[in-house]
Amino acid sequence: MAFLKKSLFLVLFLGLVSLSICDEEKRQDEDDDDDDDEEKRGVFDIIKGAGKQLIAHAMGKIAEKVGLNKDGN
């Protein structure tokens, strides 16, 4: 009976250790995914900012061509 108890405790202990290792790997994967999302957000923010500047510049040029500049000319 003592042999069975020791075996059962050993199996349970090894199971808990493997679960702990799997949880750590899962957390690391989630952290990596979060970092990727932050990088994507950073890139999209840069693209969005450049697009806004490009549109503002283009609208200014169009206004100059049409004669709607702000200087009153």
From Swiss-Prot:
Keywords: Amphibian defense peptide, Antibiotic, Antimicrobial, Cleavage on pair of basic residues, Secreted, Signal. Has antibacterial activity against Gram-negative bacteria E.coli ATCC 25922 (MIC=60 uM) and S.choleraesuis ATCC 14028 (MIC=240 uM) and against Gram-positive bacterium S.aureus ATCC 29313 (MIC=240 uM). Shows no hemolytic activity and no cytotoxicity. It comes from the Eukaryota. Expressed by the skin glands. Belongs to the frog skin active peptide (FSAP) family. Ocellatin subfamily. Residues 23-39 form a propeptide. This is Ocellatin-PT7. The keyword Transmembrane helix does not apply. One of its GO terms (biological process) is symbiont-mediated hemolysis of host erythrocyte. It comes from Leptodactylus pustulatus (Ceara white-lipped frog). It holds the Pfam family Antimicrobial15. It is found in: Secreted. GO terms for cellular component: extracellular region.
